[in-house]
């Protein structure tokens, strides 16, 4: 059975590691996970699923990758969230909020009588301590609080946050998967070793308010979450969640097919997804992600320093044919320059007519026709096929294209390499941290940004416009500035947009209530999912 896709965005820059699990080891693993979901009542109240690899440490102020968001969203909560399927910001631990006329002061009205898992009140004073911890830990998500000038708690349910300067992305920071979480100050103080702010303790424990408590965290083996009986919100259906670390997707598939797993959230090859769609024992949910697959051009070295050549590339490809062939109908060609949930659909269209003529006219004049085309392996077999289809489509022009795989670690290090050592062309993805265009631009276009500004683009005017846009009081005003940036980068022809990358979740047919995260659609709301 196939569910209709939700129009979401998604981000993901994750590396997938592998271990071969064979023979007896595989049989033992399947046996350990149990058989059909109907074995007994207790099994019916345990949700079982795999991760491809260990998540980063489950510290709410350190964890900054994709798959682990499932654990964090079960144990911790933020002030606000994205409404599933949209970029609309809705209440979380803050039931309402206001913004001052000068765009500097947010006043959050907190849900009353919420407690952390250790019984400490999750009040405004606790939120101030949470902000302070994130700043002090100073890991990847810390930038979300660096713009805070001061936080105040005039009463337990009122949190006043004053920014150093206007920032219209602030609520998006608070809603994104790596949002500012409420962290129990009692747990931090009690379990701190020296000045580590309980970092060691939080490697295997939690200090949140979420619907689940971390019961076991065994790296390389499994994580177990148990329902928090004093949860303030909607009680979860499942008493516990068991997440097993299973590095091979083939092993995950076998266990799903045998009923040992209730769902596999990501990672299946497209042929497997299509087969599951035809199998009534399973539900498949295909959702466009927040990342866009693009063809980057090396504008700082080699033949693609020629702007006219890059502009000719923008129209030379039959993008629809490439996307349809590589993704077999699971996503569609990108007709906007930016992901639709990150920037209003139709406001920055990109749908040029196919015209290979300008490229055919330029290629004979090039000093070299040898092209190095790489594709990032974390994007799987479809990315390889996209690269090979580009190679085939451009061959008649006389370009001599060699296709090669590039591991994610190498992609992340391109920014540190000399321009001439970067590939001429690169099939990769781009996105941000939240459903706000500023987060993508600062990652991929900001002067000096690393690691994902792989070709080290830099333009002082683009930087200035970014800083202007984020201070605008309305979306319309900000979008007008973002259109100026779009005009600049489109004219410079830095990349060719191809498609939003689809995410495919497969569940047993008796699993219902999947409410996906708007940003990472392979993450679901843990207190909404049920067995029917």
Predicted regions located by residue number:
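Long beta-strand-rich cores associated with HINT superfamily self-processing modules
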Residues: 505-532
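Structural transition elements
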Residues: 328, 332-365, 377-385
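N-terminal secretory signal peptides
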Residues: 1-12, 19-28
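Ligand-site clamp/hinge motif
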Residues: 200, 228-274, 400
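Surface-exposed binding/hinge segments that line
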Residues: 109, 143-191
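N-terminal lobe/hinge region of extracytoplasmic solute-binding protein
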Residues: 50-101, 132, 207-209
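Extracytoplasmic/peripheral linker and loop segments enriched in polar/acidic and small residues
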Residues: 402-412, 439-509, 532
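Gly/Pro-rich hinge or "lid" segments in bacterial periplasmic/extracellular proteins
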Residues: 83-84, 88, 177-236, 240
């Amino acid at each position: 059975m196939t569910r209709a896709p939700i129009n979401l965005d998604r981000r993901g820059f994750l590396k997938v590691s592998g271990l071969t699990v064979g023979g007896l080891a595989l049989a033992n693993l399947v046996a350990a996970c149990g058989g059909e979901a109907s074995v007994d009542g207790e099994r019916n109240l345990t949700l079982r699923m795999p991760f491809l690899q260990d998540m980063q440490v489950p510290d709410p102020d350190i964890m900054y990758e994709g798959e682990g968001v499932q654990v964090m969203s079960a144990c911790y909560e933020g002030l606000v969230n994205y409404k599933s399927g949209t970029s609309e910001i809705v209440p979380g631990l803050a039931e309402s909020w206001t913004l001052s006329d000068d765009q500097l002061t947010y006043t959050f009205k907190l849900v009353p009588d919420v407690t952390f898992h250790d019984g400490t009140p999750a009040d405004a004073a606790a939120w101030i301590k949470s902000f302070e911890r994130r700043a002090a830990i100073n890991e990847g998500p810390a930038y979300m609080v660096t713009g805070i000038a001061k936080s105040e708690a005039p009463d337990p349910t009122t949190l006043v946050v004053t920014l150093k300067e206007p920032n219209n992305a602030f609520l998006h920071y608070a809603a994104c998967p790596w949002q500012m979480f409420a962290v129990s100050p009692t747990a931090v103080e009690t379990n701190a070793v020296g000045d580590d702010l309980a970092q060691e303790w939080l490697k295997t424990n939690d200090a949140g308010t979420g619907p689940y408590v971390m019961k076991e965290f065994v790296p390389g083996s499994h994580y177990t979450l148990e329902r928090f009986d004093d949860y303030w919100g909607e009680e979860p259906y499942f008493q516990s969640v068991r997440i097993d670390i299973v590095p091979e997707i083939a092993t995950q598939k076998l266990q799903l097919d045998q009923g040992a797993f209730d769902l596999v959230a990501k990672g299946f090859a497209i042929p497997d997804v299509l087969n599951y769609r035809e199998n009534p024992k399973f539900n498949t949910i295909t959702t466009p992600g927040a990342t866009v697959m693009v063809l980057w051009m090396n504008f700082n070295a080699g033949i693609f320093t020629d702007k006219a050549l890059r502009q000719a590339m923008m129209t030379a490809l039959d993008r629809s044919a490439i996307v349809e062939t590589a993704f077999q109908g699971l996503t569609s060609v990108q007709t906007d320059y930016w992901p639709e949930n990150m920037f209003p659909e139709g406001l920055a269209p990109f749908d040029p007519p196919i015209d290979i003529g300008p490229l055919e006219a330029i290629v004979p004049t090039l000093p070299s026709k040898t092209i190095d085309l790489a594709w990032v392996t974390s994007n799987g077999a479809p990315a390889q096929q996209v690269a090979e289809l580009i190679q085939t489509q451009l061959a008649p022009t006389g370009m001599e294209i060699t296709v090669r795989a590039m591991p994610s670690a190498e992609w992340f290090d391109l920014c540190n390499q000399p321009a001439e050592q970067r590939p001429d062309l690169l099939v990769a993805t781009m996105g941000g941290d939240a459903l706000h265009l500023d987060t993508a631009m600062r990652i991929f276009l900001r002067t000096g940004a690393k690691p994902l500004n792989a070709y080290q683009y830099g333009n002082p005017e683009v930087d200035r416009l970014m800083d202007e846009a984020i201070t605008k009081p309305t979306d319309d005003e900000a979008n007008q500035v973002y259109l100026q940036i779009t005009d600049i980068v489109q004219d410079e022809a830095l990349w060719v947009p191809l498609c939003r990358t689809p995410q495919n979740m497969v569940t047993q047919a008796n699993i219902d209530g999947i409410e996906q995260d708007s940003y990472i659609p392979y993450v679901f709301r843990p207190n909404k999912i049920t067995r029917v």
